[in-house]
Amino acid sequence: MRPARSIRRLGVAVLSVFSLLAYPVAGQAAGPDPVLLIHGWRADASAWDVMGQRFAALDGRTVVALTLPGNDNVVNGQYIRDQVAALGWSRLDIVGVSMGALSARYYVKSLNGAAIVDAYVSLGGPQYGIMSACFLPQSQGGQMCTYSSFLKALNTGDDTPGAVRYMTLWGGSDTTVPQSSTKLDGGACYVTVPKVVHTAYEEDVAVFNAVVRAVDGGTTWCPGTIK
């Protein structure tokens, strides 16, 4: 876990010994769903500093970024479930980047998160795996392997259960996760943002704008194609 950084500079409130970063906003009464941000492989909550601050500038928006316990998506999904319960949220939107999109989808699909999640957004998520992860231990990122038992189970049955708005976004310059692997089968919004590399999803403004449309809903929530 990264050492403490300048909290004043980040403008965040730090809870639970850096396991959670909350980006405070003025007037958090009635308003949009809270947004939960899930980081990628070997990262932590601070990966969302830029997007978190952008969300914090929107009216009435509660935004929380978690630091996951490790790189096992099953354990991470359970941790997400427990943190949502601890936060007392009855509705939320969830955004995951890279491997974090798998941890988030495990929570949505396998742990009944679909009952309270309004929008699920995947940024460069390897939904159907990447070969480069096949060299990693299962609990250290190997679950992202195309042939992992985790992905086989996760992708069995309906990819997009419930009344959730599903968006999968891919950066046109992402050479880590192929576009074909980022898509979900049935009822998802597919978006490509040109010239975005795999490490830039959390900071790119066009990606942020697409995420906002997805979590806000409405008739124009999908800036891409729904299939």
State where each predicted segment sits.
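Short, surface-exposed "cap/lid" segments of acyl-processing enzymes
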Residues: A30-A65
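C-terminal catalytic-base region of ester-bond hydrolases, centering on the histidine
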Residues: D159-K227
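N-terminal secretory signal peptides that target proteins for export/translocation
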Residues: M1-S6
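Bacterial N-terminal signal peptides
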Residues: G11-A22
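Short, structured coil segments at secondary-structure junctions
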Residues: D59, I116, L184-G187
